[in-house]
């Protein structure tokens, strides 16, 4: 983004931001799977790897954000004012996804490292379809951002909202089970409940990220569209 042409800088900035959002979304999907696999399989190695990689990703995100902010300051002022909100919403969403991974990872790593009782098979069986649906939607989101084609964005957002409702139901079911379960499985049950809570939060975060990308890449965002975004979760 060393060009002196403001319009060219805007084009390059949009490409750079797309690459940032899609790469962090893809990293989150892959690492989320790695963490939950490590917990369900009682395998400490992938959990340790995820811990180290996520710290590195946080450092890299700060570097990318600094570069993009410099680019934002060099585009036409009217466009910069319009895009500022969506840029920061997208960047903050990337950061929040990494924090969400850490909040899932830490209890899983501690649980496996201490050789506590494993999660019940019934919980795994109900969780895996939810995880697959989450990953499928995140992949669709990556595809929309990579191609800069948001034709399916509304459908993705709707299915994401439906997924949040499914996870909410599982959370309630899990809390009911915990009240009736033996103390021997309580620790694993608490970790699983945390996974469900953070998974629900993760859905909210990447839905924000998709909206942010769509509005940042758009040539014009109407006040009505902006108001719709501010009223949604």
Task: State the predicted function of each range.
Residues 1-233:
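Cytosolic, long alpha-helical scaffolding segments
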